[in-house]
């Protein structure tokens, strides 16, 4: 009889226990996101230079301090980032600290890349004040319409760039129209304050204005860009990007810089400064194959570039100066040539027309987190080019290994044929935490 009662009580007690437990069930509240974030990025970079000792830039740079046929360069950098959110306000900080053991000298550099406060009084309005990165344009290798962008490295998209000191206003509005779905306006005010704020734009006290009108029209992203100020040409630009299919997208940019300065140098070393309206434009495509290979191709017309004859004169002057120095031993000749050509070599590309192509393959042979690639940049006027094979590998979380080799190819008197390196392997490791 006791066994019978025992078997009857067990399911009753289990049911009662379950019912009682249900009365005390409670939902575990979701963890609130932290109002702050901190991050660090460490990078070690090694570069091997195999010099072209006959190239004009090498002769001008190292005639008074010959490094030999090759040299090693090492860089180590730390980037510290932080963010804070308090209601509708957000603050961000990004600092860059780099030590370089170069071919001729060593140096330590400390820069504030970003440091700004952002206020969002409504979902449609954002106000920024401070130093913030400006990344406009749709081009991959070039951005002719992005007048405020810092020069970027198309083969290193994760590279952080220094921002601009500004006061910014962003307005965004979603629409329900059939054609126009979104519209946005960005207005930037950029002051020049002595050496620490936008000094590369103009003189102390100058004030610059930039606008970008964004439209999402028939599934096409369009930007209309304006930039003007006392020390820069008035500039007008437009860019677009559109997905034609899930695996193919097109993009383009066009820009007009009005009354822009243009410096030329002839075979005798005489310089002339002209003013002209410079049209630049870019058209590109991005294609993803069924085997996860990505192909990017771009054509770029550089309105500020030089025709083939102008480049011939530019390199002929340097060759003449080098011959005079070799025959007379007068170093003042090369010092003068180095000073006169410095502004030209500060330009990323000297020519008029370029073609860029990059092919990357995701995880070939089932090697996880490994992407090899190859890129080529061709000067379509003198047919010299730069070939760059490389790879990116992420062997573990937050660790990235990169390798690339720059190989400039072309005869003397051409843009890439006169590069100071015959080839330049480069490897860098990044660790995030």
Give short role names for the model-derived ranges.
Residues 28-59, 89-93, 183-187, 372:
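Transmembrane beta-strand segments of Gram-negative outer membrane beta-barrel proteins
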Residues 40-42, 93, 129, 169, ...:
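Membrane-embedded beta-strand positions of outer-membrane beta-barrel proteins
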Residues 44-52, 86-88, 95-101, 133-135, ...:
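Transmembrane beta-strands of outer-membrane beta-barrel pores
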Residues 70-76, 108-113, 161-165, 205-209, ...:
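Residues that define the transmembrane beta-barrel architecture of outer-membrane proteins
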Residues 76, 81-184, 188-190, 215, ...:
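Outer membrane beta-barrel
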Residues 87-93, 124-127, 176-185, 217-224, ...:
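Repeated loop/turn-to-beta-strand initiation elements of outer-membrane beta-barrel proteins
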Residues 237, 249-366, 374-376, 416-418:
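Extracellular/periplasmic loop regions
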Residues 355-359, 405, 419-433:
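Outer-membrane beta-barrel "beta-signal"
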């Amino acid at each position: 009889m006791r066994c019978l009662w025992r078997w009857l009580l067990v399911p009753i007690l289990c049911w009662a226990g379950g019912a009682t437990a249900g009365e005390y069930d409670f939902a575990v509240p979701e963890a609130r996101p932290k109002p702050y974030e901190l991050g660090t990025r460490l990078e070690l970079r090694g570069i091997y230079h195999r010099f072209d000792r006959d190239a004009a830039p090498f002769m001008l740079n190292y005639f008074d301090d010959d490094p030999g046929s090759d040299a090693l360069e090492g860089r180590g950098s730390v980037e510290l980032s932080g963010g804070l959110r308090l209601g509708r306000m957000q603050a961000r900080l990004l600092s860059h600290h780099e030590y370089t053991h170069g071919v001729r000298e060593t140096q330590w550099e400390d820069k504030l890349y970003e440091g700004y406060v952002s206020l969002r009084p409504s979902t449609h309005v954002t106000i920024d004040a401070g130093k913030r990165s400006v990344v406009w344009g749709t081009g991959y290798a070039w951005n002719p319409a992005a007048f405020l962008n810092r020069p970027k490295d198309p083969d290193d998209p994760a590279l952080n760039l220094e921002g601009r000191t500004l006061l910014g206003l962003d307005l965004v509005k979603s629409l329900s129209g059939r054609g126009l779905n979104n519209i946005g306006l960005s207005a930037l005010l950029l002051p020049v304050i002595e050496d620490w704020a936008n000094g590369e734009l103009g003189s102390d006290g100058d004030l610059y204005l930039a606008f970008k009108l964004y439209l999402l029209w028939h599934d096409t992203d369009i930007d209309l860009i304006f930039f003007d100020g006392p020390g820069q040409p008035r500039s007008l630009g437009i860019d677009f990007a559109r997905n034609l299919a899930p695996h193919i997208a097109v993009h383009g940019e066009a820009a007009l810089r009005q009354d822009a300065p243009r410096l030329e140098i002839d075979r005798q070393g005489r310089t002339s400064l002209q003013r002209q309206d410079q049209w630049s434009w870019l058209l590109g495509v991005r294609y993803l194959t069924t085997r996860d290979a990505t192909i990017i191709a771009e054509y770029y017309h550089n309105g500020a570039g030089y025709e083939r004859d102008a480049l011939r004169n530019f390199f002929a002057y340097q060759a003449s100066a080098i011959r005079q120095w070799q025959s007379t031993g007068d170093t003042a000749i090369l010092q003068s040539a180095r000073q006169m050509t410095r502004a030209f070599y500060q330009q990323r590309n000297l020519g008029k027309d370029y073609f860029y192509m990059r092919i990357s393959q995701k995880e070939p042979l089932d090697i996880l987190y490994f992407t090899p690639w190859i890129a080529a940049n061709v000067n379509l006027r003198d047919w010299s080019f730069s070939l760059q094979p490389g790879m990116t590998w992420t062997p573990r979380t937050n660790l990235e290994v990169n390798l690339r080799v720059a190989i400039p190819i072309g005869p003397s008197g051409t843009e890439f044929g006169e590069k100071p390196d015959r080839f330049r392997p480069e490897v860098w490791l990044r660790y995030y935490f």
